[in-house]
Amino acid sequence: VNRLDLELIKKLIKDHTLRHADMITKSMIAERYYANKNDILFIEKKTDEAENPLRNADNRISSKFHGLLVNQKASYMFTAPPLFDIKNEDANKSISEVLGDDYAKTCKDVCINAANSGVGWLHYWIDKNKEFQYAAVDSKQIIPIWSKSLKRELLGVLRVYEDLSENGQTYDVYEYWNNTECQAFRKLTSSTVDAGLEAYTMFTSFIVDTEITEQSDTFQHDFGAIPFIPFFNNNISTSDLDDVKPLIDVYDKVFSGFVNDLEDIQEIIFILTNYEGESLGEFLGQLKKYKTVKVENNGESDKSGL
């Protein structure tokens, strides 16, 4: 994909961000369940229960099943991360040194992102010291541009994220990556793409011949490939939560209801009429010991009792 002008990038953003919004919503729900913030915590109490003095308990028990399953999966797969063997001992050692100590953690991060979002993304680059770097990227930020062929080819990547400027204004930043360069754009979060999108000079480059540092909206990476690698959670790119969310919600509802019932049992109100005893302590003692209490009765019309 060649360099895009401002109008083309506006069209690209509008065409793809709308469809990406559904993925963001689902990912945020999965991440919320991963953090043990299940739906049960946000359900409003029923009006009829709120007005019932005998139904005061409102415990919300959120179960961390999704987080436990995802962490177990990531640990099982990447406690010992994949090894590279190119049949050369020195080269294998060099690869291990380049990948560094963060390799296992990064693998787990990508796995967790894929489990929550359906796909995890790895970004790689060359830093200012000319060293190879890589990191997991929040899947909600990445909008892939695929070809329409049967063997889908990654034509470009649109990375979208919020950024706070030095003057305290919030911007939406759009990075468009192809196989040779990255173009940067931004707009105020409060503005629209059509009205507010502009080139963003976020990259700093040093010109050797003139020894001048200049700002640019374009960064040449020259990898010859788009420096983002997708890792799909499964063949249909669904999250791990999709299969278990109904079970988790039912468990939370039943368990929370059970705890509420146990607590509400203690809220029973006794109305005593013509009780023969002299104190409430005696009444509760008889009720506990004999499961009955004695009351006076003054005839058929008398409604003495509890």
Region locations from a protein language model:
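N-terminal start-of-domain structural block
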Residues: V1-K37, L197-D242, Y251
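Extended, regular secondary-structure scaffolds
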Residues: C111, N116-S117, W121-I236
